[in-house]
């Protein structure tokens, strides 16, 4: 992986902390809307981490593919992931 590992790990650790906080909120019977807002915030951070990884894939794996066939394969991989992201 050629992505900025420090940035990715920071984002994922932030999401992890938020999810742990959400679990505590559930145990403490916090208002549902507040819990939902925290879930949305966690999902947004995970999405940012995914975008960073996909960006690195485009900049490194696709660009540096050794053959046209390999480039097409890498592009198909990212296309399939983007379809999932957009859903």
Locate the predicted segments by residue:
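Solvent-exposed interaction patches of small proteins and small membrane subunits
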Residues: 1-87
